[in-house]
Swiss-Prot record:
Pfam families: Dendrin
Coiled coil ranges: 103-134
An annotated Gene Ontology molecular function: DNA-binding transcription factor activity, RNA polymerase II-specific
Gene transcribed to yield this protein: Ddn
Positions of the UniProt region annotated as Interaction with MAGI2: 186-236
Organism of provenance: Mus musculus
Name this polypeptide is given: Dendrin
Membrane topology annotation: Peripheral membrane protein
């Protein structure tokens, strides 16, 4: 499931990879600069599901119907959506969620379910009341006998407690899966199908429905379970945190305090997932160590304590739970109070440790604020999670897939001893296991029930710069200029002035070749060719030159670079070219640090000014052809062409442009007027002038260069 294109997680995606490499990237996109890896780890582990069931999310456990203990489908629950094979793995399914049976059918079913659950709950509540002494029931104040109403009130509250009293009520008896009062039509959480929800179910609901908690025991639970696409966003999308407004509002029926708690918990002060998500989908991972469910209740500890009661000391459990609930509930008495009967039910249920049934999230929220939750949350813990004192958790039935499981070794041990050393266990556990790897509840699922789902998508976006390949530094320009590339650009290569001029005269060929060959290092050609090349491939040349020369882009040929915004590496050429351009000028130019542009850390090549000038012209495509006037203008332009140069992203070329502007301006002014040869000569002159005015201009222009560069 981790393999394959991000969006084609479908049947076509490489299954073997998915199966074999759960760790492989779901989707990797690489470009020169960006590597995006999307890794999705989705682990679904359903202990409760009958082995025979294959794990297809579509066979959601609710779809499974009553058999799906996990889902706790009520017999009346709407028919399961047609099972969709896992094969269709889509990140976003067109319809992951079913509207469910028609509203009336749903309502009817829900009513039936509700009635049944209420009756059962009434009975349970009575029993619990008797057992627990009605510790919490009184707060409700509603006669439990009237379970229907009380239940109703509680249910609106979203107290799963009420809906699942039976669960706690009988230790031995597993609560009827179908009983969940979820169906309460009024209940917002009626269920994706039952809820009158126009939109896709919340992701939690979606997971539950999709069988995200696959009902079938994972065939290969060493591997993460298949990916469950989020519900489609065709309708208003309920996110996990959606308020169960209706429930909350109804919750007050059971008791105002609960709503307060709900407010806290369900009211999104704290976003809590449906308890079932914690219990079934998230499995142990959903339980936070010290705190019960992911929701963050200390319920865990309470749950831990509960296992003993689970043994069958329902009463004791009730006491424990009551104590826990009371402590929690007391701390959040409102929530607890709200759940008076519910609390009892919860206690008995918790004690029963019967497999949890899905419950409206609100319930959990109502269940309480953290503290309250602590007691309540246990309720959510599937029995299997509570290490049954009687039977050690099945080693392989750990909630987590083996590879990631904290480890069969320590895990079970820690959990196993839980009974006596509940807290200590947790402590030990924490110590021994890394927090992030250990299941949130240190309680190994003893039974088949429960679903373990880890759905983690990790998107790694690495921005890595892939430098362009460096070119050989020593390429000679074949254009007849036989200047050997000067490895150190700054070292003025005493090219013959005539040669330099010749190069300038043949700048197209020379520079093209130079730049093309990235022989920016060749001083004379570097300079002359640079001018030519500047036009042709300023950016590429600059890059190449910087690569070949090994200079910083800005350093190579600032003048060159300006032609192309991208020609930041041309600036690297700049120094090299100037070296070639004129040794004489080079010395002067060398004397002048090319700091003006701020582009080069090192001193500019001897002919940096001239080169920059040439490059500027090249970039501007305004090389003075035969017109010295034009050349002068160009020099002016080169000064003024900063804008265009500025366009270039590279500061270095900007600097060089600025420098060329300086150089050009002066050189142009003082440049010889002639044909192309003159232009070359002019370049040489410019170099000399550039050196003179370069310092001046440099000083003057440096700010500009810096500005441009920046």
């Amino acid at each position: 499931m981790l393999d394959g294109p991000l969006f084609s997680e479908g049947p076509d995606s490489p299954r073997e990879l998915q199966d074999e490499e759960s760790g492989s990237c779901l989707w990797v996109q690489k470009s020169k600069l960006l590597v995006i890896e999307v890794k999705t780890i989705s682990c679904h582990y359903s202990r409760r599901a009958p082995s025979r069931q294959s794990m297809d999310i579509q066979a959601s456990y609710w779809a499974r119907g009553p058999q799906s203990r996990t889902c706790r489908l009520r017999p009346g629950s709407p028919e399961p959506p047609p099972r969709r094979p896992w094969a269709s793995r889509v990140l976003q399914e067109a319809t992951n969620w079913r509207a469910g049976p028609p509203a009336e059918v749903r309502a009817r079913e829900q009513e039936k379910r509700k009635a049944a659950s209420q009756e059962r709950e009434a009975k349970e509540t009575e029993r619990k009341r008797r057992k627990a002494g009605g510790a919490r029931r009184s707060p409700l104040g509603q006669p439990r006998p009237e379970p229907r109403n009380a239940l109703r009130a509680a249910q609106p509250t979203g107290f799963p407690v009420f809906s699942r009293p039976e669960r706690f009520g009988q230790v031995g008896r597993a609560p009827r899966p179908s009983v969940l009062p979820q169906g309460d039509p009024g209940v917002a959480w009626a269920g994706p199908w039952g809820g009158r929800r126009p939109g896709p179910p919340s992701y939690e609901a979606h997971l539950l429905l999709r069988g995200s908690a696959g009902t079938a025991p994972r065939r290969r639970w060493d591997r993460p379970p298949p990916y469950v696409a989020p519900p489609s966003y065709e309708g208003p999308h309920r996110t996990l945190g959606t308020k169960r407004g209706p429930e909350l509002s109804r919750a007050p029926t059971s008791s105002a305090p609960v709503p307060a708690t709900t407010r806290t918990e369900g009211g999104r002060t704290k976003k809590r997932l449906d308890p079932r998500i914690y219990r079934d989908v998230l499995g142990a991972w959903g339980l936070r160590q010290g705190r019960g469910l992911l929701g963050g209740a200390p319920g865990c500890t309470a749950a831990r304590a509960r296992p003993e009661s689970c043994k069958g000391a329902i009463e004791k459990s009730s006491g424990l739970v009551a104590a826990g609930l009371n402590s929690a509930g007391d701390s959040h008495s409102q929530g607890k109070t709200t759940g008076g009967p519910g609390t009892d039910a919860a206690l008995s249920r918790s004690a029963i440790s019967s497999p949890p049934r899905p419950v409206p999230r609100s319930r959990q929220h109502l269940r309480g604020s953290r503290k309250g939750k602590e007691g309540s949350e246990q309720i959510w813990l599937p029995t299997c999670w509570l290490a049954s004192p009687k039977k050690p958790p099945v080693r392989h039935s750990q909630t987590l897939p083996r590879p990631w499981a904290p480890g069969g070794t320590g895990w079970k041990e820690s959990l196993g001893q839980r009974e006596g050393a509940e807290h200590e266990t947790l402590e030990v556990w924490k110590v021994t296991r890394r927090a992030h790897t250990l299941p949130r509840i240190s309680r190994g699922p003893a039974g088949r029930e429960g679903i373990f789902v880890i759905d983690a998508t990790c998107v790694v976006i690495k921005s890595q710069y892939v430098p362009t390949p460096r070119t050989q530094q020593g390429q000679l320009v074949p254009s007849g200029e036989s200047c050997s590339v000067s490895d150190s650009l700054s070292q003025p290569k005493p090219c013959h002035e005539e040669e330099g001029e010749g190069a300038a005269a043949n700048p197209s060929v020379c520079q093209k070749r130079l730049l093309s060959s990235r022989v920016l290092n060749q001083p004379s050609e570097g300079r002359e060719c640079e001018a030519e090349v500047g036009q042709q491939g300023d950016s590429s040349l600059e890059e190449r030159s910087s690569s070949g020369l090994g200079f910083p882009v800005g350093e190579v040929n600032p003048r060159d670079a300006p032609t192309q915004p991208g020609s930041q590496e041309h600036p690297t050429l700049g120094p090299a070219a100037p070296v070639c351009a004129g040794s004489l000028k080079g010395s002067e130019a060398a004397g002048v640090p090319r700091r003006a542009g701020g582009g080069w850390a090192r001193t500019p090549g001897p002919y940096a000014g001239a080169l920059r000038e040439a490059v500027s012209r090249i970039r501007r495509h305004t090389a003075p052809d035969s017109d010295s006037d034009e050349a002068e203008d160009l020099s002016v332009h080169s000064g003024s062409s900063d804008g265009s140069d500025t366009d270039a992203p590279g500061a270095s070329w900007r600097n060089e442009r600025t420098l060329p502007a300086l150089g050009n301006t002066r050189p142009r002014e003082g440049g010889k007027t002639a044909g192309l040869s003159d232009s070359i000569r002019e370049i040489v002159d410019v170099i000399s002038q550039t050196e003179e005015g370069f310092i001046r201009e440099d000083t003057r222009k440096t700010p500009q260069g810096n500005r441009e560069r920046e």
